[in-house]
């Protein structure tokens, strides 16, 4: 199955251009390997699944950003991330869902990693749990799953989770990737979907409609994506018009 992902580069305030990338995706299998339910010292609980070693390792990493369009995950793209992780620990973040990435990332790609842990962060209180921020900071690769970017912005922005992700990108310099909603929040400019998803027809008819909610340089900070806004699921539904509006 082929899926399109577009990235728009903004040279504010005048020049806008886009580049089209086409990937061929292969559907991964999802298998639950291990469930962990954590309680930290402040009595906040959160859900996490982990596969692999329980001992943290530190490896030599190379920074990079992996943007995925929200279709079936691309094996080569994730292999590229893990090759930059040097066999370290992988953390997957999401605000809902399951551990569907764990076994796929740990044992089905042929690139060794020490562990893969999926963490559900579905409230601002959980985004402030010190143990979660520490797990993120200790990662050698980070992947932000698809879902609803409005929840990522609402729950994670201006919290220790945001600080930890930016630490990985800019200080520790590890590979960071995202698909769908996880891709949407990686640009310096990002569509937050705070007022529900806007269609191309709605956005083109009124660029100032309440559904056109754009964040600017106030969340995640990647030098690779300065002056960039992303959008995903380009063919279903058609999102060319709304990204032009963005």
Where are the model-predicted features located?
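Short, intrinsically disordered, charge-balanced linker/junction segments flanking boundaries
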Residues: 243-246
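Short glycine-rich loop/turn motifs that provide flexible caps or phosphate-binding loops at active sites
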Residues: 37, 68, 145-146, 177-181
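Beta-sheet entry/capping signal
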Residues: 33, 89, 142, 173-176, ...
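Bacterial Sec-dependent N-terminal signal peptides
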Residues: 1-45
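Extended, subdomain-level signal for the structured scaffold at the beginning of enzyme domains
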Residues: 44-151
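Class I SAM-dependent methyltransferase SAM-binding "motif I" and its flanking Rossmann-like core
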Residues: 154-241
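Polar helix-capping/helix-linker motif
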Residues: 24, 128-129, 158-159
């Amino acid at each position: 199955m082929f899926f399109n992902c577009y990235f728009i580069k903004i040279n504010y305030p005048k020049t806008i251009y886009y580049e089209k990338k086409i990937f061929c995706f292969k559907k991964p299998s999802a298998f639950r390997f291990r469930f962990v339910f954590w309680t930290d010292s402040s009595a906040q609980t959160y859900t996490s699944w982990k596969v692999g070693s329980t001992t943290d390792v530190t490896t030599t990493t190379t920074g990079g950003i992996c943007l995925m369009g929200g279709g079936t995950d691309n094996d080569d793209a994730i292999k590229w991330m893990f090759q930059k992780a040097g066999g370290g620990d992988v953390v997957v973040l999401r605000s809902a869902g399951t551990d569907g990435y764990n076994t796929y990332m740990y044992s089905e790609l042929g690139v060794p990693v020490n562990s893969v842990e999926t963490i559900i962060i579905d409230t601002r209180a959980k985004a402030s749990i010190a143990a979660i921020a520490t797990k993120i900071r200790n990662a050698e690769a980070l992947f932000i799953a698809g879902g609803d970017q409005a929840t990522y912005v609402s729950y994670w922005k201006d919290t220790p989770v945001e600080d930890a992700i930016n630490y990985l990108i800019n200080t520790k310099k590890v590979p960071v990737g995202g698909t769908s909603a996880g891709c949407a929040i990686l640009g310096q400019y990002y569509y937050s979907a705070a007022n529900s998803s806007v269609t191309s027809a709605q956005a083109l008819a009124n660029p100032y409609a309440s559904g056109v909610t754009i964040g600017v340089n106030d969340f995640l900070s990647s030098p690779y994506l300065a002056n960039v806004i992303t959008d995903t699921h380009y063919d279903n539904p058609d999102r060319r018009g709304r990204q032009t509006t963005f």
